[in-house]
Swiss-Prot record:
SUPFAM superfamilies: Nucleic acid-binding proteins (SSF50249), Translation proteins SH3-like domain (SSF50104). It comes from Draba nemorosa (Woodland whitlowgrass). Part of the 50S ribosomal subunit. PROSITE patterns: RIBOSOMAL_L2 (PS00467). It holds the Pfam family Ribosomal_L2_C. GO terms for molecular function: rRNA binding; structural constituent of ribosome; transferase activity. One of its GO terms (biological process) is mitochondrial translation. This is Large ribosomal subunit protein uL2cz/uL2cy. InterPro entries: NA-bd_OB-fold, Rib_uL2_dom2, Ribosomal_uL2, Ribosomal_uL2_bac/org-type, Ribosomal_uL2_C, Ribosomal_uL2_CS, Ribosomal_uL2_dom3, Ribosomal_uL2_RNA-bd_dom. GO terms for cellular component: chloroplast; mitochondrial large ribosomal subunit.
Length: 274
């Protein structure tokens, strides 16, 4: 990712950074509107997820996570910004005239060719089943259910690793550190998702975060007792408890929240690292 820094004239330009060399003019037939029913609210209008609201209006980009254009070579025409994710997207022109968006693989440039199928080269951006990949391959956009499309390792900079194949399953090490089993017939894309340094980008001011739909976060220790269990006290006081809790009194910061009886319990060989 190319990050452009401005000369210091105001605090927002002094501390902020923007991406360069990325376009933002999507094709009309590959975008659609999306329905927003209250940021962070449920059907009754009650806040279920805090710190969400506002933000700039977005158009959804239709991205090809299935990569089901088999054995048809495509060429990367543009690398574009997507407001719905941290990763960039690529516009692909296929040989049969079809145009699709895919996630931008790290290192891919305009003019590169990609293809998906069963016996395709192990090359960055190509999509193929796990059974055809050698051990140690770096992959992203991984299917969990055959034919449903990629669901794992899709964020900016995400990459998983194929570490073993045995029987009908393949063993993957996911970006979170979790090691789990997936069917060898599921497909994935070779390489790492681009825009790796997005977590090092400084927004520069609070208004830039408001454009993203994120509202301010207030610490519980500076609230009143009526608003948070950590609140109250004279001056800067500790939380007054053995362990921190949520605004509703449930244990926080360290308590495991995963449900015990899940279908994937037998597929996870090692839980994700904290």
């Amino acid at each position: 990712m190319a990050i452009h820094l401005y000369k210091t004239s105001t605090p927002s330009t002094r501390n902020g950074a923007v991406d360069s060399q990325v376009k933002s003019n999507p094709r009309n037939n590959l975008i659609c509107g999306q329905h927003h029913c209250g940021k962070g609210r449920n059907a009754r209008g009650i806040i279920t997820v805090r710190h969400r609201g506002g933000g700039h209006k977005r158009l959804y980009r239709k991205i090809d996570f299935r990569r089901n254009a088999k054995d048809i070579y495509g060429r990367i025409v543009t690398i574009e910004y997507d407001p719905n994710r941290n990763a960039y997207i690529c516009l692909i022109h296929y040989g049969d005239g079809e145009k699709r968006y895919i996630l931008h693989p790290r290192g891919a440039i305009i003019g590169d060719t990609i293809v998906s199928g069963t016996e395709v080269p192990i090359k960055m951006g190509n999509a193929l089943p796990l059974t055809d990949m050698p051990l140690g391959t770096a992959i992203h956009n991984i299917e969990i259910t055959l034919g449903k499309g990629g669901q794992l390792a899709r964020a900016a900079g995400a990459v998983a690793k194929l570490i073993a194949k045995e029987g009908k399953s393949a063993t993957l090490k996911l970006p979170s550190g979790e090691v789990r089993l997936i069917s060898k017939n599921c497909s994935a894309t070779v390489g790492q998702v681009g825009n790796v340094g997005v977590n090092q980008k400084s927004l520069g001011r609070a208004g830039s975060k408001c454009w993203l739909g994120k509202r301010p976060v207030v610490r519980g220790v500076v609230m009143n007792p009526v608003d948070h269990p950590h609140g109250g006290g004279e001056g800067r006081a500790p939380i007054g408890r053995k362990k921190p809790v949520t605004p509703w009194g449930y244990p926080a910061l360290g308590r495991r929240t995963r449900k015990r009886k899940k279908y994937s319990e037998t597929l996870i060989l090692r839980r994700r690292s904290k």
